């Protein structure tokens, strides 16, 4: 008689149902044939079942990796701490290169207050919104789940990594289809630590991070070079009607005298400092060693953390506070969990403004006068001796004046309170019931004050009319709040029929989110120190209070079934039906599904006794996921009441044309994968190929105001993302005292537009007809091309005889005239391969590790060449190549047009470059104090480490990075002690 052993485990942190494969005892003959294989399988499924890498946490339930048909990347909290201990989103890129935090031009740098609003997993599957002639940004984010409950990206951005037990990225239909209409951009599931049983433990962690601004991408001219450039460009020549050659000569001589006297102001350093962050985390875990009456056990944990960050730009900062408790009460049948968390974030923007202002300031200007006062305006008149008349003044606003003398500021405060409650009931050995309830409230306040002495009002300085005075100074105050109520019920069934295992889940959930917001602007501040809104005289001219109120309800039912035969052949099915108030009246619900297969080849008899292959599995899955990237008012008509009365009634105008046929876009996912482990798990590899097609892409179209409304939302295009990703790890040395591990991962994704609507084609025609008025490349929707395709006019380079650019028109002829209709695809901003190489060495109590990011094959449009070498403002500083590499005389073979040519350069293939990039993401050294040394003390564990992030960045494309806020290199000191 065969004995059946059924294992059902539960992950305490998420209250998720965990499925393990049932084991059936073998006959003597089977034991002999498969002894080694079964030993490995049972170890994976039982002994190591709770370890990261052996259990896939989906948020609703968990499965052993050997029974999972989907694609998931798993990272432990400890592994994340080794790469980046302060920014979880940046750290995830190291473990999964298909997880991309998008900042295409590197605008935001290391701004601590920039919350990523575009994160892609396996490519872009959402079309951007468009106006009548240009591209608009769109927010694309994966779903973030913490302990089974959905949270926003800011919650993850500010999360204390010390609380994290594991992170799982779900990337295909079999992994994420159970999330239905939310899963098209992927799912990130975070599991926090749970109290340890039978002991009291106190853990304290301190991080101290130094940030050093990285200005290596800037190649600006010094004072002498700027003056030489301006001279050669004819800035001081009297070529305009009415200009006086003598006065212009005076201007040049004044600037030259300043240069010869040694004036060479390095403006880039003025708003910068060494940033510093100190972060403290305290976690207390308690659990009585003895059970309460009835076998009831209690576990309790409390967490408290504080982070103070002063950014690399003076005055910028971000303070975060977290506090919470987790209580678990359980017996042999029922377990109740309650998790209460509070968080608060205070942020402030730098009063020094955008960093790009400092990259433009002329270095032959001084920031202070002879008395040490900061200049309000930078001009040659500041340098000229008294009585000297000037022509060209080259005036510009001092970028430091407002920060030094005025009291303008921009701050925000956000608070969140969340309570998650869960109950698990083990009804029988085969049947379990799980219920969850969550209540979350967010409130935010934004304050922005502009002093009446700001440059914004400089033109009114001479005016003393009351109306002009009442327009000086501005205070904008905004409030927003959001309350989310969520509930779910899930039942699971697991049974084994000999070698045939059946696992099933049936669940339902509902969520309601209520949002409110208001904002208004007041003006008329009579003094710089009157920096609160109550000092204002009136509302902004023609202004009023704006705001909104909305309520979104969603509900879904889902079913997941898993069938397994002998832990060799597995089939996984998921079905979900979603309903949402976001949908149009004609499309109230949308179905989603997935089907997956897995073959554990290593469990076959013909693999028994293999000394090389310890694991080999093939899997494939298909299915659908969805996206709800729009608001409720886009499915119904919206009106605004007019303020004037006609016939005793208020009139109304339509502001939004509703689309009753609007439905969530659907992505059809197809994935095949391979998993293998060789030589006793020394070599582990995973490879996945995917082909995802998104149908009915949601796009906002901005239309002519004459229609009576501004925009409408429609399902207007189909996309495909095709590619592969892989992960390889190898341990050449694995002894008791020495462990060496090498990792390599990579990804390639190609995006293709399959179908566009007539409205999108009209947008293309409009762009090609007039060039949209932009000098830089404009996005176009073209079937067969990528969303990342660069459109420009083909160029033959600069004519050595004239210094003008030669173009190739659409008929193949050469011409000096740029025409928008000649724009063609000239490159695709998609790397051939992007990934990370890692090396980790552990020797006794010491650890050292590093990760390098590589990328090659992408075409990029070099905006620095376009805007800081050509299309330059001659009265500002520019890239040094504007002086050294622009055409100056007939016969010059130059990359850039004539130095005296100040006409606008438009999108051209000259500025498209092929990139190869290598950067060091992290370098870490750690020491773990031997437990023998700590014996007899209150300390049970002591770990010290130092981690450097972003130490270098090397690229074949040289362009400025961090234009709004500079990038930084950071060094973090970490100390963790457990009592």
Question: What kind of region is each of these model predictions?
Answer:
Residues 89-90, 94, 134-136, 142, ...:
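Short acidic/polar hinge/loop motifs at secondary-structure boundaries
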Residues 203-260, 519, 714, 731-829:
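Conserved small-residue
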Residues 22-81:
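Short, acidic, small-residue-rich periplasmic hinge/interaction motif at the N-terminus
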Residues 65, 71-74, 78-85, 95-120, ...:
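Residues embedded in well-ordered regular secondary structure
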